[in-house]
């Protein structure tokens, strides 16, 4: 935390609860001990100007957008620039989105290549920028304008092909929850004017915490973090082994501890089904039938889940490997892999006990291994100071 405190200006007391014509603020976003982004915004009249420094990639990037606000808390136009750090660097992406009653028109230039797209949408759809809490304030105001609790707010990521639904709730006058489909909500501390004063996403997929400040010096932040990207926060990994004549492949994402308590904490709570990784559901494919925990696992592909608990862990193999679909969409070759929040117990193939033991030293990044043992092998999951494992044999 000390690495960025010197270029932050701390916020004062909350502003008046009545809506303001003009407002400004900043957010510092952290994932465990790591600062992953900083945001600064100014809202004046019908214009929202937002600047953000993002570290969650191969390089540190700067994102700038200007949105034109409507009286009903919808948006009519957004212009976006994303560029690497360094004032002379050209934009990686420049784009303009124009919002009409039944469509969004995107004009984008990426690495010199211009593209245009028309996307059919419902009236009042909002743009969505990951980690932009200034835009979450707009989402909250839009939810109030629509009325209801909960209320659905439709958003579309910049240049995306399809919109997405957010569920917005107001549990108390000073709180708001925002959730994507099948995900736990990010929780916000808000005031009567819709300003966000605190963000707790530890129960959601992203796990991010954000703190509001009066301002942030992005130039100083850029100098501090320019050569210190965090890379992909939970990088994709895979393994491919042959044991006792059976070929086993596993694809999964690898979250890191980042100074957090993992098991029994907010990252992996006890007695909740865990995606056993991050992002998309972990997938296991076997070329031959296996026997695991006394149960036969037919050859094929499965998603891998776990149910950690203080008294013991369960390994869950599930038949569902692709995203939920309807009718003809289920046959499309472009159908996405299953996201890690879309677990469906009615598709379980097997639930078996895992052996759980402590590790002599912490494992920073979640790791899956398959190793030979006896006349078969063992599947091992390691993270923090815990190893969970189960032996198997080829049938």
Q: Where are the model-predicted features located?
A:
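Short, exposed beta-strand-loop hairpins at the edges of beta-sheets
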Residues: 188-189, 196-203, 378-383
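Positively charged n-region of N-terminal signal peptides that target proteins for export
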Residues: 1-4
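Short acidic, Pro/Gly- and aromatic-enriched capping/linker segments at domain boundaries
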Residues: 23-26, 223-242, 277-290
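Extended, well-structured beta-strand/loop surface patches
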Residues: 229, 251-299, 305-395
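Bacterial N-terminal signal peptides
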Residues: 6-16
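Solvent-exposed helix/loop surface patches that form functional interfaces
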Residues: 90-181
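N-terminal mature ectodomain segment of secretory-pathway/periplasmic proteins
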Residues: 30-109, 170, 178-180, 194, ...
């Amino acid at each position: 935390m000390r690495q960025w405190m010197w270029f932050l200006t701390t916020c004062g007391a909350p502003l008046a609860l009545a809506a303001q014509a003009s407002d400004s603020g900043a957010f510092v976003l952290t994932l465990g001990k790591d600062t992953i982004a900083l945001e600064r915004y100014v809202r004046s009249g019908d214009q929202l100007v937002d600047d953000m420094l993002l570290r969650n990639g191969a390089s540190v990037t700067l994102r700038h957008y200007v949105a034109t606000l409507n009286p009903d808390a919808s948006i009519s136009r957004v212009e976006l620039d994303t560029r690497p750090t360094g004032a002379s660097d050209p934009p990686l992406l420049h784009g303009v989105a124009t919002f009409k009653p039944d469509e969004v028109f995107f004009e984008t230039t990426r690495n010199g290549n211009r593209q245009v797209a028309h996307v059919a949408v419902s009236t009042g759809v909002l743009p969505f920028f990951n980690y932009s809490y200034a835009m979450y304030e707009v989402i909250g105001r839009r939810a109030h304008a629509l009325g209801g609790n909960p209320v659905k707010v439709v958003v579309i990521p910049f240049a995306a092909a399809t919109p997405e639904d957010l569920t917005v709730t107001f549990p108390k006058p000073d709180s708001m929850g925002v959730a994507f489909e099948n995900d736990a909500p990010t929780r916000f501390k808000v005031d009567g004017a819709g300003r966000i004063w605190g963000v707790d996403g530890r129960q959601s997929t992203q796990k991010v915490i954000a703190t509001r400040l009066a301002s942030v010096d992005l130039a100083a932040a850029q100098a501090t973090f320019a050569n210190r990207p965090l890379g992909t926060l939970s990088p994709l990994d895979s393994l491919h082994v042959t044991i006792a004549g059976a070929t086993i492949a596993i694809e999964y994402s690898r979250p890191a501890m980042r100074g957090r308590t993992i098991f029994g904490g907010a990252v992996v709570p006890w007695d909740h089904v865990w995606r056993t990784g991050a992002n998309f559901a972990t997938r296991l494919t076997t070329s031959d039938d296996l026997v695991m925990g006394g149960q036969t696992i037919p050859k094929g592909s499965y998603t891998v889940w776990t149910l950690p608990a203080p008294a013991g862990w369960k390994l869950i193999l599930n038949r569902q490997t692709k995203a939920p679909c309807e009718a003809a969409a289920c046959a499309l070759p472009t159908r996405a892999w299953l996201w890690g929040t879309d677990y469906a117990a009615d598709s379980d193939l097997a639930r078996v006990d895992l052996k759980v033991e402590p590790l002599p030293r912490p494992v920073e990044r979640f790791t899956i291994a398959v190793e030979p043992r006896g006349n078969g092998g063992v599947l091992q999951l390691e993270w923090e100071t815990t190893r969970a494992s189960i032996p198997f044999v080829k049938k």
